[in-house]
From Swiss-Prot:
Involved in local disassembly of cortical microtubules when associated with ICR5 and KIN13A. It comes from Arabidopsis thaliana. Keywords: Cytoplasm, Cytoskeleton, GTP-binding, Lipoprotein, Membrane, Nucleotide-binding, Palmitate. The keyword GTP-binding applies. InterPro entries: P-loop_NTPase (IPR027417), Small_GTP-bd (IPR005225), Small_GTPase (IPR001806), Small_GTPase_Rho (IPR003578). A lipid is attached at C202, C208 (S-palmitoyl cysteine). This is Rac-like GTP-binding protein ARAC10.
Length: 215
């Protein structure tokens, strides 16, 4: 129990500026949408979280997507276990930058680290007033998000809204699963090996017993 409880997972959010990364983190950690002041970068956060029976200590790191932070941002990538790569469902540019900017950056500074692809601001995609105020806007569809997920090799693609809290928890649950999945598989393999060894021992005893009986 102690080993699973002490497992630390460093989760880093990345993506263009103004896609809602900080709001998503605030919403996840406080269960409310920030209406007054939204900081540029969310303070690092750590808490014990239980996902599928496994307790982990989840550490959340926020990053600023603006170009001014291009040199500083990669310092947050060191030791990352998983990335939450975000784009806005109502920003075609942020969607395109996932493949053009963020994947090359992550592959350069943190190769091999798994990621969860997230489309934010889900509530605005169907908001008639918002769409009317932004003529010519072409929201990203679920199918296009899935297509991008396959292209970048992400296991999960989740659409969420910090304002309504829809799927926000699912984002970070998926990030945790992405890290603990190999650990669970390894535990299962170890259990299987122990069981096979135990069964082999029992079989040997039975055979030995038979030999003794024949004598």
């Amino acid at each position: 129990m102690a080993s699973s409880a002490s497992k630390f997972i460093k989760c880093v959010t990345v993506g263009d500026g103004a896609v809602g990364k900080t709001c998503m983190l605030i919403c996840y950690t406080s269960n409310k949408f920030p209406t007054d002041y939204i900081p540029t970068v969310f303070d690092n956060f750590s808490a014990n979280v239980v996902v599928e029976g496994t307790t982990v200590n989840l550490g959340l790191w926020d990053t600023a997507g603006q170009e001014d932070y291009n040199r500083l941002r990669p310092l947050s990538y060191r030791g990352a276990d998983v990335f939450v790569l975000s784009f806005s469902l109502v920003s075609r540019a942020s969607y395109e930058n996932v493949f053009k900017k963020w994947i090359p950056e992550l592959q350069h500074f943190a190769p091999g680290v798994p990621l969860v692809l997230v489309g934010t601001k889900l509530d605005l995609r169907e908001d008639k007033h918002y769409l009317a105020d932004h003529p010519g806007l072409s929201p990203v569809t679920t199918a296009q998000g899935e297509e991008l997920r396959k292209l970048i090799g992400a296991t999960y693609y989740i659409e969420c809204s910090s304002k309504t809290q829809q799927n926000v928890k699912a984002v970070f649950d998926s990030a945790i699963k992405e890290v603990i999945k190999p650990l669970v598989k390894q535990k299962e393999k170890t259990k299987k090996k122990k069981k096979q060894k135990s069964n082999h021992g029992c079989l040997s005893n039975v055979l030995c017993g038979r030999i003794v009986t024949r004598h």
